[in-house]
Amino acid sequence: MKKISVIIPIYNASNSIKKCIESIKIQKYKNYEIILVNDGSNDNSEEICLKYQEKNNNIKYIYQKNMGVSEARNNGILNASGDLIYFMDSDDIISPNLFDTIINNFTDDVDCLWFNYKKIYNYDNQWNAEYDVGKIRNTIINTSEFERKVLVEDDGFLWNKVYKLKLIKDKEIFFNKEISVCEDLLFNMEYSKYINNIKKCEYIGYAYFQSTSSSFNKKNNLKWFSILEAYQILESICVKTDIRNFIEYNALYYQCEGYARNKYNTIKFSKNISRVKIYDKKSLKILFSKNISIKKRMKLALFIFFPNLVFRIKQRNIKNKKY
């Protein structure tokens, strides 16, 4: 029976880590290990983790000085001993039968398992529906379709995918420690270079906790600008024409937002962000690309012409939880 290694980076997660761990402990499938990587928390996360480690021989606890989520996950990979690897965030929870679903569907011909998730705003009664794990509809997709969906549908997340640990270690697929946002997208695109079959399950296995006080989208969050660096890396490594179009579209879109963010920040991003011009060769290429939907092209055109206005509208909608 395949062993599942669950890696959970932790930073000041004392209010949520218990719920996260308990959602794993209630799994019917028991051949798993939990690797808790404390990234230099200054709350009582360590105390909570040590108590769980003391009472559960399948829980490993690792402390590292604050080096970021990418290094925490890399540390988890190096200490994992399972066949399959699964990444969680410390404030999220999983379905009670997720591991059964993983084992039933991650057959020998599958290189990556991909399932659905939902956003939640509290932890109460999130899994009322019972699934018959033997009757979940699934399809096999190839690498190109996987990459396209990850980019077009903004689904570069880790926590709704399961990977082969041996492949990750053999190919040395690790997280870029210089990137703090979109590091998961880079990981998925790198992993896709070495695989053939991805199984997509129509099953909601993960609950992503959406905090209304999250600082990520706030206009003065400098970590946001890591997105621009991530897409520069993607542009440099991607050679597939159809996939590259989507990467270039996203890169232009985020450049427009970065330009507007840099204008509104009281603390400026260290690198100059030029305004995207409609007549630039790259802009024209994407705006007339048939691979990109008309809706997306119109959205980009508006952002190019009116970056500050679109950014202000986007910020207002985020505040109202409509975006």
Describe the residue ranges of each PLM region.
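Short, well-formed alpha-helical segments that are part of the catalytic scaffolds
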Residues: N12-I26
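Membrane-interface aromatic/basic loop that binds lipid-linked glycans or pyrophosphate carriers
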Residues: T266-Y323
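Donor-binding/catalytic cores of nucleotide-activated saccharide
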Residues: V69, S90-I198, Y206-W224
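Catalytic core of nucleotide-sugar-dependent glycosyltransferases
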Residues: Y203-S211, N217-Y249, Y253, G258-S283
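Short beta-strand/loop segment that forms part of the nucleotide-sugar
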Residues: N31-G40, K60-K65, D89-S90
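A conserved acidic beta->alpha catalytic loop
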Residues: S23, N38-I48
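Glycine-rich, basic loop-to-helix element that forms the pyrophosphate-binding segment
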Residues: Q64-A80
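Short aromatic/hydrophobic "clamp" motif used to bind/position activated sugar donors
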Residues: I85
